[in-house]
Amino acid sequence: MFENIYIQQRIEKANKLREDGINPYSNESSRNCTISKYLNVNSDIFQLEEKRDENRNYTVAGRIKFFRLMGKASFLKIEDESGMLQIYVARDNLPENFYNEVFKKNIEVGDIIEISGYPFVTGHGELSLHADSLKILTKAISPLPEKFHGIQDKELRYRQRYLDLIMNSEVRKTFHIRSKVISLTRRFFENKGFLEVETPMMHPIAGGANAKPFVTHFNALGVDRFLRIAPELYLKRLIVGGFEAVFEINRNFRNEGMDATHNPEFTSIEFYWAYKTYKDLIVLTKEYFEYLFENLNLPTILPYGEFKIDFNKFSEIPLIQSLYEIGGVPQDIVEDKDKILAFLKANNLEANANLNLGQLQGELFDEFVEAKLINPTFITEYPVEISPLARRSDEKPHLTDRFELFIAGKEIANAFSELNDPIDQLQRFEGQIAAKEAGDDEAHEMDEDFVNALSYGMAPTAGQGIGIDRLVMMLTNEHSIRDVLLFPAMKPIKQEIDLYSEEK
């Protein structure tokens, strides 16, 4: 594994440190200041006449990102999570022979070191640290990529995220924002009186959304289990039990394709609110975005690729209406199954003739409308046939009290007034079974226990899911879901395939 000549040279240096009585993997650090704090508390040095203060002493630590070795003195740049700092190392300020025998011969870019010293400003006007002592904390035996400003190979970045994080500070910034989004999301719902809960990750029935599940086996019980597609049915059981506002932030798993907006495991928040409707959730969603933007200090008009997304403008339009007003689909065909099939065929699009009208309307939306929804848009009134868990509209029984929120052509949220009629729910599940038999692999399974829960009475409730990954993509101007996941799913490399074959 470590046959590379450059790695071998670094291993030799680590061994030389050991021979000199220096542990190249020390477990003790005396750091008392992060780099950002050092730069902040010493900003007044620029105002001092001598541009230095030898009475101050700080100990910082970080990875060497740049090394300019000179005769009796050297300049380094080290980086910790908070920032980068220039270090001045002079031979005569270190213990005898340390500079020539240890520092110059065995320390290099990539190593993690600890330095103590005082602040000063260089002749070029850069606040730096004048080293009085230096200690190696971790010897890196693999050299960093040559490019100081990072690695450009995306495949390598995703497979070796640790290396990507070392080399690209902007990547670290993205994941700081992601973490803050999750933290703010939790705080927003807690402030609204919601209770955070945890529900099972392994389900006896693949349910909660229309998707293909991952299957595993529970050895102790001798039964198969499904990694959860969505937590919806368990959260609604809690509403039946008497909790009136619950949320869960966690992973979901869908055994489907990967692309710029889909990863087999992803993070979402789902929340359910008793005595509310989907219209209340539209208001809540707007408040949520306002809260995020305020606390992230983001402008309300954000660039996203070629677009500028205006988060001051949330529009709302029924799905059927969007087909002809936004998608350009002829208005006279949108309620006729045969005409839709002919229209799809005329546009060189495949359509299963076994699909019902609502499913075909969904196909039209996916093909002709979704990508055009740039500014935040609530698409409402989805057909019953593609909304097996949503409540029927009282005014239009063939439609549901549902919305999906789209931004930059991507679905960000899905919400509806919940179906709480157990008989209607049973019939919907039976319809989904028929759809599965007709070839719909993603149709919902029958869940008799959930129907039984509804039979005890569930208060009028509205529920919603928001995809955290896609939301972070919008907020950070990233165009692949892999760029907002620390460790995205990747195709196995040849060694992994060979190892798996041997184990089998």
Swiss-Prot record:
Signal peptide residue numbers: none
Subunit structure: Homodimer.
InterPro entries referenced in this protein's UniProt entry, alphabetically: Aa-tRNA-synt_II (IPR004364), aa-tRNA-synth_II (IPR006195), aa-tRNA-synth_II/BPL/LPL (IPR045864), Lys-tRNA-ligase_II (IPR002313), Lys-tRNA-ligase_II_N (IPR044136), Lys-tRNA-synth_II_C (IPR018149), NA-bd_OB-fold (IPR012340), NA-bd_OB_tRNA (IPR004365)
Gene3D superfamilies per UniProt: Bira Bifunctional Protein, Domain 2, Nucleic acid-binding proteins
Documented EC number(s): 6.1.1.6
Species assigned in the record: Aliarcobacter butzleri (strain RM4018)
Cofactor: Mg(2+)
One GO cellular component term noted in the UniProt record for this chain: cytosol
Annotated GO MF terms: ATP binding; lysine-tRNA ligase activity; magnesium ion binding; tRNA binding
Cross-referenced PANTHER family: LYSINE--TRNA LIGASE, CHLOROPLASTIC_MITOCHONDRIAL, LYSYL-TRNA SYNTHETASE
Pfam families membership: tRNA-synt_2, tRNA_anti-codon
Entry note: cofactor: Binds 3 Mg(2+) ions per subunit.
Alphabetical UniProt keywords: Aminoacyl-tRNA synthetase, ATP-binding, Cytoplasm, Ligase, Magnesium, Metal-binding, Nucleotide-binding, Protein biosynthesis
Primary localisation category: cytoplasm
Top-level taxon of origin: Bacteria
Catalysed reaction equations from the record: tRNA(Lys) + L-lysine + ATP = L-lysyl-tRNA(Lys) + AMP + diphosphate
Residues that hold Mg(2+) 2 according to the record: E411
Similarity comment: family membership: Belongs to the class-II aminoacyl-tRNA synthetase family.
One annotated GO biological process: lysyl-tRNA aminoacylation
Protein's recorded name: Lysine--tRNA ligase
Record localization: Cytoplasm
Broad class of enzyme this protein falls into: ligase
UniProt-annotated binding residues for Mg(2+) 1: E404, E411
